[in-house]
Design a protein with these regions (language model features):
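GST-like fold's C-terminal all-alpha helical module
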Residues: 96, 100-192
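Short, solvent-exposed turn/loop segments enriched in Gly/Ser/Thr/Pro and often Arg
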Residues: 10, 150, 196
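Conserved beta-strand edge residues that scaffold enzyme active sites
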Residues: 37-38, 176, 197
Length: 205
């Protein structure tokens, strides 16, 4: 029996991983269709003219922006909530998500697909951005929030990939390491991993 929700997802990608973690946090049943971006299935081509991933399908609704998908899922399935109740808290987390999307994610894409020289420049820049973010991980058990949020679902897939990208945490990065180890044990994160992503590094004991 097919579920009402279907997610077309790449097997190893931070934006796709983010949506899978949101779905896992919500405990929502869905059909996962892992897609080779270079060879998309006919279903995806018919549903999404951009053939972009991730693509979420719920009955007649088709969504294909990670941010839109994440906010839709949080509103469509309100428990547990993945954003703070207060406007200030929501705005703060949205800004953090935008920074990760605009500043961090493109660097990961350059590291994985660019030339050797481009990858090295991007690797240094991402290392610097991670180092600059250390104080943010001291603020709360989760990322700038008392509970798991969409921001955690955005940043954890990035942190999971750092070692595979050749990026070591800075000397003062223990707050990030502690946060990452907590989050990598979280059931939603564990359930969000594909077989390919599980091979990137070991889960903490």
């Amino acid at each position: 029996m097919r579920n009402n929700l279907t997610l077309f997802s790449a097997a190893d990608d931070v934006l796709n991983h983010r949506v899978r973690m949101i779905l896992a946090a919500k405990g929502v049943a869905f059909d996962l269709v892992l897609v080779d971006p270079a060879n998309p299935p006919e279903d995806l081509i018919d549903l999404n003219p951009y053939q972009s991933l991730p693509t979420l399908v719920e009955r007649e609704l088709v969504l294909h922006s990670p941010t839109v998908v994440g906010e839709y899922l949080d509103e469509r399935y309100p428990h547990p909530p993945l954003m703070p109740a207060d406007p200030l808290g929501r705005a703060r987390l949205r800004l953090a998500i935008v920074r990760i999307e605009q500043d961090w994610v493109p660097l990961i894409q350059t590291i994985t697909t660019g030339s050797k020289a481009q990858a090295e420049v991007a690797r240094k820049r991402l290392r610097d951005l991670v180092a600059q973010s250390v104080p943010l991980f001291k603020a709360a058990r989760f990322f700038l929030n008392a509970e798991l949020s969409l921001a955690d679902c955005t940043i954890c897939p990035v942190l999971w990939r750092l070692s595979a990208l050749g990026i070591a945490l800075p000397k003062d990065g223990k707050p990030i390491e502690d946060y990452a180890n907590r989050m990598f044990r979280h059931p939603a994160f564990v359930r969000s991993l594909t077989d390919v992503e599980r091979k990137l590094r070991d889960l903490p004991v």
